[in-house]
Amino acid sequence: MRTQVLFLIVVLAVMASGDDTAHVYCGRRLATMLLYVCDNQYQVKRPPYISSENEGYGWKWLERQRARQLDEARGKRQGIVEECCNKPCTENELLGYCYK
């Protein structure tokens, strides 16, 4: 019951705002917004992976995880928390996480 009330409040707040301003969404609020924006179907957006386990690292004797840790050129993986909790994001950015 409490979750339903929270969900309803968030939905009404989003509908009332009507604009696409950026907001910070964290924790349960982020999950609730994803469910609302994505119509209950969302997925985790992941960067493409290298197909071969050690391809591209040049350190074939190291395990994949250790080689990835040593690879300084590799950028930080961005996810929904980085995009919407650590900094404000818009509904359009949230839509990028919806299942297509």
Swiss-Prot record:
As for family, the record states: Belongs to the insulin family.
Task: State the Pfam families in the record.
Answer: Insulin
Biological role stated in the UniProt entry: Brain peptide responsible for activation of prothoracic glands to produce ecdysone in insects.
Q: Which InterPro entries did the record assign?
A: Bombyxin, Insulin-like, Insulin-like_sf, Insulin_CS, Insulin_family
User: What is the predominant subcellular site recorded for this chain?
Assistant: secreted
Give the species: Samia cynthia
Question: What is the residue range of the signal peptide feature?
Answer: 1-18
Propeptide stretches in the record: 47-75
Name of the protein: Bombyxin A-2 homolog
Read off the PANTHER family from this record. INSULIN-LIKE PEPTIDE 1-RELATED, INSULIN-LIKE PEPTIDE 2-RELATED
Protein's cellular compartments: Secreted
**Annotated coiled-coil segments of the chain:** none
Tell me which UniProt keywords the record has, alphabetically.
Cleavage on pair of basic residues, Disulfide bond, Hormone, Secreted, Signal
Can you cite an annotated GO cellular component? Answer: extracellular space
S-S bonds: C26-C85, C38-C98, C84-C89
Q: Which GO terms describe its molecular function?
A: growth factor activity; hormone activity
Per UniProt, subunit arrangement is: Heterodimer of a B chain and an A chain linked by two disulfide bonds.
